[in-house]
A protein has these predicted regions:
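A conserved beta-turn-beta hairpin within the catalytic core of GNAT-like acetyltransferases
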Residues: 89-99, 109, 155-156
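Conserved N-terminal entry element of GNAT/NAT acetyltransferase domains
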Residues: 1-37
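Conserved GNAT-fold acetyl-CoA-binding loop/helix
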Residues: 25-58
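Conserved beta-strand in the GNAT
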Residues: 72, 79-88, 98, 103
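Conserved active-site alpha-helix within GNAT-family acetyltransferase domains
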Residues: 115, 139-157, 162
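Conserved GNAT acetyl-CoA-binding A-motif
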Residues: 125-136
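Residue-level recognition of the GNAT/N-acetyltransferase active site
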Residues: 105, 138
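Conserved acetyl-CoA-binding loop-helix of GNAT-fold acetyltransferases
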Residues: 101-104, 110-123, 150
Length: 164
């Protein structure tokens, strides 16, 4: 399968990205950042307003200390087949990034598209003088854990939540 990978340069495809996210999410993907951001109501349930929340988050460009970057993979018909949401943060101490989301069309898994997205993001991080990349993953998302370990990511903590 032929595909291209590029950083999203404008907001004209936000609705398409939101729809792609919603179509390819699973509950195993939910981690504490999905709960904190309001995307999920707890570790097993997505927010019923997920479309509006994602649209707002993907359109948000008002914060000067952070920058949201979205890397997409698309096929020859320009359909999105994969996406990576990358949050670049300037903490005042050093610049780092949070790999917030990475989703692939389930029908094309195993074709190295996820690897291409991640390798591209890592290379760009070096170009942007980013010192490290953080990510977190749902506790049951074993496939993602193995994938990220393969690329040198190390487990540095465990997160716990008490829903009130």
């Amino acid at each position: 399968m032929e595909y291209t990978v590029q950083w999203l340069s404008d907001n004209t495809r936000i609705k398409e990205l939101v729809n792609f996210f919603i179509s390819h999410k699973t509950t195993s993907y939910i981690s504490h950042s999905e709960i904190i951001s309001g995307r999920a109501v707890d570790s097993k349930h997505w927010n019923s307003n997920l479309e509006a929340i994602l649209t707002d988050q993907f359109n948000n460009e008002n914060n000067t200390s952070t920058q949201l970057k979205i890397l997409i993979a698309e096929n020859n018909n320009h359909d999105i087949i994969g996406m990576l949401v990358f949050h670049v943060i300037n903490s005042g101490f050093r610049q780092y990034a949070v790999l917030e989301d990475m989703l692939l069309d389930q029908s094309i898994r195993g074709m190295s598209i996820g690897s291409t997205l991640l390798k591209n993001a890592i290379q760009e991080s070096k170009n942007w003088d980013i010192h490290f990349i953080l990510l977190e993953s749902g506790v049951d998302n074993e496939g993602a854990h193995h994938f990220f370990n393969k690329y040198g990511f190390e487990k540095v903590s465990e997160n716990y939540i008490l829903m009130l």
